[in-house]
A protein has these predicted regions:
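Glycine-rich phosphate-binding loops of nucleotide-dependent enzymes
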Residues: 1-184
Length: 184
């Protein structure tokens, strides 16, 4: 759908970031009520927002801190990650997603937009979601990273993950998605 068609509002409501006015949601065949993003995370959902700088990265934190923050929130304050778990998780996703960074302790704000987006993807993949919502994940990034993200989406879907991929680019949707819905 085009900008302004309600795509982001719809997925934000599904994820619990915004309140839904009406409707029902089923996860694994069971009707659920999602009031907060934490509710969605506990149901196996992950959401990469449209606006990387305003809603995605936490600019003053390191690459490591940005990667582990969602898993730590999902586990809760009474089950903190150890320093080794944090370092191992960050290193795993830096390598897996080929994030170009001097170290895991580099401030995320010093990375390119494409590498920031990969850090956010790593954050959500670390939570081991069943359902990944990607709102304009390739907007404003270089063509190489765009291709890497599209390939990752196809690989995740091949591995059985449900992925909702929102894009304004019809060509990208045709290349990346097995099914499409158009909002007007």
């Amino acid at each position: 759908g085009l900008l302004g068609s309600g795509r982001s509002e719809l997925v934000r409501a599904i994820y619990g970031a915004d309140k839904a006015d009406t409707g029902t949601l089923k996860v694994k065949g069971k009707e659920v009520k999602i009031n907060t993003p934490l509710d969605a995370m506990k149901l196996g959902m992950a959401y990469l927002p449209e606006d990387r700088k305003a809603e995605g990265i936490i600019a003053d934190l390191s690459v490591r801190e940005n990667i582990i923050i969602a898993l730590q929130a999902k586990r809760g304050m009474f089950h903190p990650l150890s320093k080794k778990e944090m370092e191992d998780a960050a290193d795993k996703y830096i390598k897996l997603l080929q994030i170009k960074t001097a170290s895991r302790e580099t401030p995320i704000k010093s990375l390119s937009g494409g590498n920031q987006q990969k850090v956010i993807l790593g954050r959500w993949l670390l939570t081991n979601p069943d359902y990944l919502i990607l709102d304009e994940p390739t907007r404003g990034i270089d063509i190489g990273t765009k291709t890497e993200i599209q390939k990752l989406v196809l690989d995740l879907a091949d591995q059985g993950m449900a992925v909702t991929f929102i894009s304004s680019e019809a060509e990208e949707m045709l290349r990346t998605c097995s099914r499409m819905a158009v909002l007007r």
